[in-house]
Amino acid sequence: MALCHRSRPPDDGAGWVRRLVTARCRRVDGVRCTRTPRGRSEGGRWSRRDIHTRHTEKKHRHVFADGPAVVDGDRTRTWAQLYGRCAQLGDALRKQGCGRGDVVQCMLDNTAEMVEAQQGVAMSGATLGSVNTRLDAATVAYVVEHSDARLFIADERYEATCREALATLQNPPPLVVVGGQDDGYEALVESGDAAAPWTPPEDEWDALALNYTSGTTGRPKGVVVHHRGAYVQALSNAIDFGGLPADGGTRYLWTLPMFHCACPCAKEIAATAC
């Protein structure tokens, strides 16, 4: 189970994710602390190093550079290639104005692009939202509007549903389609620079992913997963699995739709080889 913060949004709904992400007050061991970036208290009474899954990405880029990272049909991407494309996507999103406190919603199947989004959105500093691909247009519209999405990335299979949903919104985010004749997603990635500098999250409690419940007892509710929670769960998986051989020979067959677990999943599986 992911370690996550559940927050009841205010009645207006707009911008609640941004307010949650940028909140500077947290409870640590039952004591309310006002923290500066990098996790030091204002009074200097406690200090620690922020932890996040960016460490594992850099490690795999160097140690398993030529090893396969993602196999999607007849497409195979090495760890070096995956890292490069994620860095490009992160830079491209920053150029689009996406950053800390913003949400990038995705409606994608289990594809290489979904894996790239899981990493690339985080590298831009933004928060990834993964929309259930089985939702109807009305519910998609609610999730996109409620999360105050800055950008919406969707597979061409769901383009019609997404356009129908966005047409009902007053201020819809731009839609980037994966596949099709134009393939706006590829154009977006190519607009980014893989060598552009990027920094880890300002705070380990910053939002990494925003997952929405199915809404069985009402409207879907947003559940925030922070960087620290994803990292700790990655270590938990490593312990549960007993560690994986570091020879790059292990393969994980992904059958669960990625939108169910969103961001942390890929990082948790990858981190077990650390």
Where are the language model's segments positioned?
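Conserved short alpha-helical elements in the N-terminal third of ANL/AMP-binding
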Residues: 120-124, 251, 262-274
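Conserved adenylate-forming
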Residues: 93-98, 195-206, 210-254, 266
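Adenylate-forming
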Residues: 60, 70, 82, 86-89, ...
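ANL superfamily adenylate-forming
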Residues: 160-204
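Conserved AMP-binding/adenylate-forming core of the ANL superfamily
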Residues: 68-111, 115-119, 136-141
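A short N-terminal helical cap/helix-turn-helix that marks the beginning
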Residues: 46-69
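Conserved ATP-dependent adenylate/AMP-binding module captured primarily in the ANL superfamily
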Residues: 135-165, 233-253
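Short beta-strand->loop structural element characteristic of the AMP-binding/adenylate-forming
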Residues: 105-107, 114, 118, 122-153, ...
